[in-house]
């Protein structure tokens, strides 16, 4: 997928394994993986961080192949899913950081421009999540309350 606010085409991406079956050397069962996911979610980790830990420490390449469900669906079934979608959360976090930078460096025109781009991405993503009913229809991004969302 191409980049939104940059000239790069973004063609590089990781390839999923061809076989969708569980490797024979993996000794973890579906329930073991789910318990591990619950434990990591209770520590406050995001779904992608959970996936990285499971991949690097436990040898689970794809949680979906082992459990039959994605990490976020497993968390939703247990009520441990984050309130905001992860990509939206990170964009808001970035916007808060840039706004904090602009408070200290008022003349930084480039940062001001980048903040506009970040916030336009936030609005676009929020509109998408409202149509998919992930966010409530009255949810609105406001820069004044954004720091409370990511705190």
From Swiss-Prot:
Ubiquitinated at Lys-27 by RNF14 and RNF25 in response to ribosome collisions (ribosome stalling). One of its GO terms (cellular component) is nucleolus. This is Small ribosomal subunit protein uS15. There is a cross-link at residue 43 (Glycyl lysine isopeptide (Lys-Gly) (interchain with G-Cter in SUMO2)). The modification N6-acetyllysine is found at residue 27. SUPFAM superfamilies: S15/NS1 RNA-binding domain (SSF47060). One of its GO terms (biological process) is ribosomal small subunit biogenesis. PROSITE patterns: RIBOSOMAL_S15. One of its GO terms (molecular function) is small ribosomal subunit rRNA binding. InterPro entries: Ribosomal_uS15 (IPR000589), Ribosomal_uS15_arc_euk (IPR023029), Ribosomal_uS15_N (IPR012606), uS15_NS1_RNA-bd_sf (IPR009068). The modification Phosphoserine is found at residue 30. It comes from Homo sapiens (Human). Component of the small ribosomal subunit. Part of the small subunit (SSU) processome, composed of more than 70 proteins and the RNA chaperone small nucleolar RNA (snoRNA) U3.
């Amino acid at each position: 997928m191409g980049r939104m606010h940059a000239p790069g085409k973004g063609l590089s991406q990781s390839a999923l394994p061809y076989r969708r079956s569980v490797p024979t050397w993996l000794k973890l069962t579906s329930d073991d993986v789910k318990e591990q996911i619950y434990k990591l979610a209770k520590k406050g980790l995001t779904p992608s961080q959970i996936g990285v830990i499971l991949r690097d420490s436990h040898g689970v390449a794809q949680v979906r192949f082992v459990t039959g469900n994605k990490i976020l669906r497993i968390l939703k079934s247990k009520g441990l899913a984050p309130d905001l979608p992860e990509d939206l959360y990170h964009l808001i976090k970035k916007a808060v950081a840039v706004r904090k930078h602009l408070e200290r460096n008022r003349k930084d025109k480039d940062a001001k421009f980048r903040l506009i781009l970040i916030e336009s991405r936030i609005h676009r993503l929020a509109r998408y999540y409202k149509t998919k009913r992930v966010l409530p229809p009255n949810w609105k991004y406001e820069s004044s309350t954004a720091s409370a969302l990511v705190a």
